């Protein structure tokens, strides 16, 4: 089966704040690597996913009329399969377009560090989109292997010894961390 024909893929869930709103990122995985990302505002009355659920499956459903939607399926604490139909209804069109672009880059195998750098370099005018961007960066940084080095100089000691530790860029010389 061709990658573009995938109907169901494993997914991780990352929750984040976009301004004052609670948002959710569905990170679809292929071979344990991010393959696509969907984000949306959490609307518990329309789509409740228990806070302890952080894994499941994204299912692409093609309707008879040719339209498509995305569902999310997870196993609850009692072992029952739950399917949330139409998670795509949560996707604001503007954020959806950025997520489609990021997903396209992921599908073509760009290294996660480069994808994160690309997202970091986006200059967006809206404060809402900027806080969304930070949430997406945080979601994807989780997939960068510990010890992955960058060419960045440490803002504290000036050494080129920055590497990822637990999804956070950290100086291996002085211990400075961008995460605080």
Which residue stretches match the model-derived regions?
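Structured beta-strand/loop patches that form or line metal/cofactor-binding pockets in enzymes
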Residues: 6-30
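Long, highly charged low-complexity segments enriched in Glu/Asp and Lys/Arg with interspersed Ser/Thr
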Residues: 113-121, 126-150
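Short Cys/His-rich "knuckle" micro-motifs
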Residues: 162-168
């Amino acid at each position: 089966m061709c990658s573009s024909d995938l109907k169901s893929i494993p997914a991780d869930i990352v929750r984040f704040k976009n301004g004052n709103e609670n948002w959710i990122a569905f990170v679809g995985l292929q071979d344990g690597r991010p393959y696509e990302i969907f984000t949306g505002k959490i609307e518990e009355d329309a789509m409740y996913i228990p806070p302890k659920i952080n894994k499941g499956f994204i299912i692409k459903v093609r309707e008879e009329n040719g339209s498509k939607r995305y569902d999310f399926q997870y196993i609850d604490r009692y072992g029952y399969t739950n399917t949330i139909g139409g998670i795509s209804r949560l996707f604001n069109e503007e954020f959806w377009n950025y997520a489609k672009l990021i997903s396209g880059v992921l599908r073509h195998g760009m290294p996660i560090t480069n994808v994160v750098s690309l997202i970091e370099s986006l200059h967006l005018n809206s404060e809402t989109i900027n806080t969304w961007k930070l949430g997406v960066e945080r979601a994807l940084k989780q997939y960068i292997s510990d010890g992955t080095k960058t060419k960045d100089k440490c803002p504290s000691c000036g050494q080129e010894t920055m590497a990822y530790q637990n999804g956070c860029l950290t100086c291996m010389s002085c211990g400075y961390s961008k995460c605080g």
